């Protein structure tokens, strides 16, 4: 995942050479374009909307030319309840789904991390936005954010999403976010993921990090490894936060790195070196596993990185 494309820690990496480095050197087959809706230069808080849409268009173009999947991420965070931005979201996703209705590699993430609001409220928002997208794009995968910063339900043990999924539409997935240096994520979320799978709802990890949820402090490679092992076993896609040189431990690039592509391992952060090695190992394992298997589009979707 990029950092916010609204800012200089995010948009410089929306370039074809960066995506190609991720594909060819890291073994990634998907990128996530994180566009903040609030905060400074947010899409709904005074940012230049045409300029921000243009960053999305560029990102989708580069990913498509490289044969990669791409997530368009409506990055709800400080705004909390996605209903706050409903009118803007409907307009934005109408534009995007109309533009990309004939592409099979574009995924719509309609609310990054809802917080401080109920699943009922998120579900109402999601149903309205899904309806808009489906007017133009009948089949694209749509990922719906979940309560408590996308933890599949409110607080540690609640499972509202799996118990009451959105009905009436196909190709709907639900987001799970974890940060490997948060004890509560490691304690509660694996069981919530297992429960969601048991109930038959499709989950995508559209964001995870090796640090605490705030992005700083130490990183936890032990729990990151456990998480990625579980996700690989279940064929669940995952996107690491973040492709940035911002001076925080979850960034994949060293804060001293000025290059925006073709990074040497010495130009990566500790987290970046670890994640690159994991992605490369996963790609190698997959290619060995499936050398004789003809991959269907469904298989490809299941194995997004």
Name the predicted role of every residue range.
Residues 15-79, 86-91, 95, 127-136, ...:
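Aromatic-lined substrate-binding rim segments of carbohydrate-active enzymes
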Residues 293-305:
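Positively charged, low-complexity/disordered segments
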Residues 69, 203, 289:
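Hydrophobic "anchor" residues on beta-strands that sit immediately upstream
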Residues 1-6, 286:
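N-terminal module-boundary/linker segments of secreted carbohydrate-active enzymes
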Residues 4, 8-13, 86, 90-98, ...:
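Extracellular glycoside hydrolase catalytic/binding regions
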Residues 40-42, 81, 117-120, 215, ...:
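Short, function-defining helix-loop hinge/capping sites that tune catalysis or transport
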Residues 280-292:
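Low-complexity, Pro/Thr/Ser/Gly/Ala-rich linker/spacer regions in secreted
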Residues 32, 134, 207, 294-296:
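Short, cationic motifs built from Arg/Lys/His that form the positively charged side of catalytic pockets
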């Amino acid at each position: 995942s990029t950092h916010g494309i609204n800012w200089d820690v995010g948009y410089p990496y929306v370039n074809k050479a960066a995506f190609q480095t991720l594909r060819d050197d890291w073994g990634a087959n998907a990128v996530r374009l994180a566009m903040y809706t609030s905060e400074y230069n947010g899409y709904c808080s005074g940012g230049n909307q045409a300029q921000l849409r243009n960053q999305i268009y560029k990102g989708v173009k580069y990913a498509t030319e490289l044969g990669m999947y791409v997530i368009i991420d409506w990055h709800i965070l400080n705004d909390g309840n996605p209903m706050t931005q409903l009118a803007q979201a409907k307009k934005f996703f109408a534009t995007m789904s109309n533009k990309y209705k004939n592409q099979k590699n574009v995924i719509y993430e309609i609310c990054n991390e809802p917080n401080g609001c109920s699943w009922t409220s998120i579900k109402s928002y999601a149903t309205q936005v899904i309806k808009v997208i489906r007017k133009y794009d009948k089949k694209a995968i749509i990922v719906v954010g979940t309560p408590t910063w996308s933890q599949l339900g409110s607080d540690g043990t609640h499972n509202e999403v799996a118990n009451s999924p959105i009905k009436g539409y196909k190709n709907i997935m639900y987001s799970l976010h974890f940060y490997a240096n948060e004890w509560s994520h490691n304690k509660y979320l694996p069981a919530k993921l297992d429960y969601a799978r048991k109930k038959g709802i499709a989950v995508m990890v559209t964001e995870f990090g090796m640090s605490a949820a705030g992005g700083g402090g130490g990183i936890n490679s032990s729990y990151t490894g456990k998480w990625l092992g579980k996700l690989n076993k279940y064929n669940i896609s995952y996107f690491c936060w973040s492709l940035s040189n911002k001076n925080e431990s979850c960034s994949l690039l060293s804060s001293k790195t000025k290059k925006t592509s073709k990074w040497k391992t010495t130009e990566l952060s500790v987290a970046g070196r670890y994640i690159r090695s994991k992605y490369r190992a996963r790609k190698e394992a997959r290619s060995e596993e499936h050398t004789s298997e003809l991959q269907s589009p469904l298989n490809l979707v299941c194995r997004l990185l």
